[in-house]
Amino acid sequence: MRQTKTGILLANLGTPDAPTPEAVKRYLKQFLSDRRVVDTSRLLWWPLLRGVILPLRSPRVAKLYASVWMEDGSPLMVYSRQQQQALAQRLPDTPVALGMSYGSPSLESAVDELLAEHVDHIVVLPLYPQFSCSTVGAVWDELARILARKRSIPGISFIRDYADNHDYINALANSVRASFAKHGESDLLLLSYHGIPQRYADEGDDYPQRCRTTTRELASALGMAPEKVMMTFQSRFGREPWLMPYTDETLKMLGEKGVGHIQVMCPGFAADCLETLEEIAEQNREVFLGAGGKKYEYIPALNATPEHIEMMANLVAAYR
């Protein structure tokens, strides 16, 4: 019997190719055109997106990207490539490809790369620890569209999420411990997750429950009292209500109440990006300190640390 050859597809959101208004506009157009991200009626959404949002937001967002851009590209791309390369070294007999839902490299190019290696089974690992229809669901949809155009398709194992995975929780806990050792234990550990519209959760997206699961498991692993750990949601967009409490409003409130020392971690981000390095590490730091807080540290994402790569290797091993 012929032995199955397995490949691994690491999937993430994506990033502009450059910190310029033109590149950001291309990226945002693709991202905000996905019904999984914005499900507003197209008759209403297209004119708003093309006539207002893209022209106004692209130059401003490009400046934010420029503030965190690295020598080799955007942080998300740099760290994602490092993850791909490190996992390939950890699993030398298994092809590992990287694909993004939006921008380059695309999910289609990643699938084609693996098929060119003659794999007949692909393990898809969306690097979103907590499932949401707007992230993991978007990967699923695009993968289905890609394979629908193939005459022959490989076997697919799709990892829905890993919110309570033991190795993932331990890696997060060790990052927190390292930060406490360096900066001292903070008055409060704030866990900031990317938000989604509240309506999505009301309609069945179990993302908030998966975030609560990670928060509970991490607090338990650290042996921290519940009142010392807080969960919030960031990066809201548009006018409708999103999951609460909001990170920026919470940090302002905590500073005003006299909480002196905060450390913030973003467990839902597998790699540092604009939302962590600029929004959390810079913007929200200013919010907290401006409201009266004294000390604020951002705990980096797991990125391509050895623990994170080992977690990925162990996670996909069950499906190989």
UniProtKB/Swiss-Prot annotation:
InterPro entries: Ferrochelatase, Ferrochelatase_AS, Ferrochelatase_C, Ferrochelatase_N. It comes from the Bacteria. It holds the Pfam family Ferrochelatase. Its main location: cytoplasm. PROSITE patterns: FERROCHELATASE. Keywords: Cytoplasm, Heme biosynthesis, Iron, Lyase, Metal-binding, Porphyrin biosynthesis. One of its GO terms (biological process) is heme biosynthetic process. It catalyses: heme b + 2 H(+) = protoporphyrin IX + Fe(2+). GO terms for cellular component: cytoplasm. The keyword Iron applies. GO terms for molecular function: ferrochelatase activity; metal ion binding. Pathway: Porphyrin-containing compound metabolism; protoheme biosynthesis; protoheme from protoporphyrin-IX: step 1/1. It is found in: Cytoplasm. Catalyzes the ferrous insertion into protoporphyrin IX. Monomer. Belongs to the ferrochelatase family. NCBIfam families: hemH (TIGR00109). This is Ferrochelatase. It comes from Escherichia coli O139:H28 (strain E24377A / ETEC).
